[in-house]
UniProtKB/Swiss-Prot annotation:
Any GO molecular function: chromatin binding
UniProt-recorded name of the protein: Single-stranded DNA-binding protein, mitochondrial
UniProt organism field: Rattus norvegicus
Targeting signal (transit peptide) range: 1-16
Subunit structure: Homotetramer. Interacts with MPG/AAG, through inhibition of its glycosylase activity it potentially prevents formation of DNA breaks in ssDNA, ensuring that base removal primarily occurs in dsDNA. Interacts with POLDIP2. Interacts with PRIMPOL.
UniProt gene name: Ssbp1
Lineage: Eukaryota, Metazoa, Chordata, Craniata, Vertebrata
Length: 151
């Protein structure tokens, strides 16, 4: 008499647990980054033995704001903060294009994902590194085109 309700509750509990577990497996998430800025250095291509090569460069993004109260907001001092991002390009076609055409000072748009990785430095100390794994790069300017022509 008491067994049957306990068995029903147990079955219902197991079913709910399995539904929760399966929904976690099927749950979608998003790791997406979009950056618009200027390249800080010409790219380098690195290859660790047994791994695919990677093109690496830095990208600066700027955040600007005015200080002051609401009335003086238009007249306030402009402050700026620059954030540097490490961009890594692994996709073969994009990696080669980035290595060849990304140049210091160029204005580019990068789409990708954030990756928090670890590596061993030259002193054999474990370090953490945050990088943007690029899967799309749009070239918005060419440094050579922006320089004024003399003469």
């Amino acid at each position: 008499m008491f067994r049957r309700p306990v068995l029903q509750v147990f079955r219902q509990f197991v079913r709910q647990e399995s539904e929760v577990a399966s929904s976690l497996v099927l749950e979608r998430s998003l790791n997406r980054v979009q950056l618009l800025g200027r390249v800080g250095q010409d790219p380098v291509m690195r290859q660790v033995e047994g791994k695919n090569p990677v093109t690496i460069f830095s990208l600066a993004t700027n955040e600007m704001w005015r200080s002051g109260d609401n009335e003086a907001y238009q007249m306030g001092d402009v402050s700026q903060k620059t954030t540097w991002h490490r961009i890594s390009v692994f996709r073969p076609g994009l990696r080669d294009v980035a290595y060849q055409y990304v140049k210091k000072g160029a204005r580019i748009f990068v789409e990708g994902k954030v990756d928090y990785g670890e590596y061993m430095d030259k002193n054999n100390v474990r370090r953490q590194a945050t990088t943007i794994i690029a899967d799309n790069i749009i070239f918005l300017s060419d440094q050579a085109r922006e320089k004024p022509l003399n003469g």
